[in-house]
Amino acid sequence: MSNLLVFDNSVVTDEALVANIMAQNQGASHQLLERIGTQVQLPANTYASIQVFTKSPQPVTLPASLLETLSGALAPGGALFGAVDGSQVMDFIMAGLAQDGDKWVKPAATGTTLLKKSGGGPKKFAFKRASPATAAPSTNGTNPAATVNLNSVVTLSMDDDDLMDEDDLMEDDTNLSMPIKIPAKCDPGPGKKRRKACKDCTCGLKEMEEQAKDAQLAAQNTVTLSAEDTAEIDFTVQGKTGGCGSCALGDAFRCDGCPYLGLPPFKPGEAVSIGGASDL
């Protein structure tokens, strides 16, 4: 890998300075800073080092795009240094360079190792009963060897993949509908008002209260019709009206099942004959 010398305009105007720099870096390539990226394209991953030169006492501020070009031209592990502006820390980092003293180094590529699985499927762990053994004696030799109690060893195996159905853990519906037995301490006795269930009631009193409340709501939602409500409505009597209230106005205002379909309009209280028979 070769080295690259980058000169700005202030350096190339001094031929003696250029000759001196080239003599100290024999075999190195050189480019004009202002031509890189516009008129000259640098090869990628080629240079072991890139050194920037200027005659100005101030360091050279490199644009972010030029930094990316120089970083791409560096070989992995190569360094950029010289008259560069060290305050451009974020620009150097964004270009993929890491600071190493007064140099900015392109990190070397690291290989990736893929781990291969052995076997076709996932392994299952099994814990088997330990064989009779004795513990090692202590280093001071005062404690006797302790024997392993085989009765206390638990054998676990993950080969059994059977899962328990959670529905099997529930009792039958017949058991859920069994009457709730209230403990004696929660029963106030005959003639006394029963107290309310506790917040964290476990004796069944809370369930009884909920059942009573549900029964009360069901009774409230039941509609009971009296004989007056279910009596057949006589549309010829003053004040009596049907569901639509328009039977006396004629067929245009009568329902499909109205018994007066086909009859002319009539006045309330008027005797109306249906099928030759009077309704009086």
Curated annotation (Swiss-Prot):
Q: Which UniProt keywords apply?
A: 2Fe-2S, 4Fe-4S, Cytoplasm, Iron, Iron-sulfur, Metal-binding, Mitochondrion
Recorded GO molecular functions are: 2 iron, 2 sulfur cluster binding; 4 iron, 4 sulfur cluster binding; electron transfer activity; metal ion binding
Q: Where is this motif: Cx2C motif 1?
A: 244-247
Residues reported to bind [4Fe-4S] cluster: 244, 247, 255, 258
A GO cellular component annotated for this chain's UniProt record is: mitochondrial intermembrane space
Q: Where is this motif: Cx2C motif 2?
A: 255-258
Q: Where is this region: Fe-S binding site A?
A: 186-203
UniProt cross-references to Pfam families, sorted A to Z: CIAPIN1 (PF05093), DRE2_N (PF16803)
Q: According to the UniProt record, where is the region N-terminal SAM-like domain?
A: 1-121
Q: Which family does it belong to?
A: Belongs to the anamorsin family.
Q: Subunit structure, per the record?
A: Monomer. Interacts with TAH18. Interacts with MIA40.
What is this protein for, i.e. what is its function?
A: Component of the cytosolic iron-sulfur (Fe-S) protein assembly (CIA) machinery required for the maturation of extramitochondrial Fe-S proteins. Part of an electron transfer chain functioning in an early step of cytosolic Fe-S biogenesis, facilitating the de novo assembly of a [4Fe-4S] cluster on the scaffold complex CFD1-NBP35. Electrons are transferred to DRE2 from NADPH via the FAD- and FMN-containing protein TAH18.
Q: What is this protein called?
A: Fe-S cluster assembly protein DRE2
Organism source for this protein? Yarrowia lipolytica (strain CLIB 122 / E 150) (Yeast)
Upper classification of the organism: Eukaryota, Fungi, Dikarya, Ascomycota, Saccharomycotina
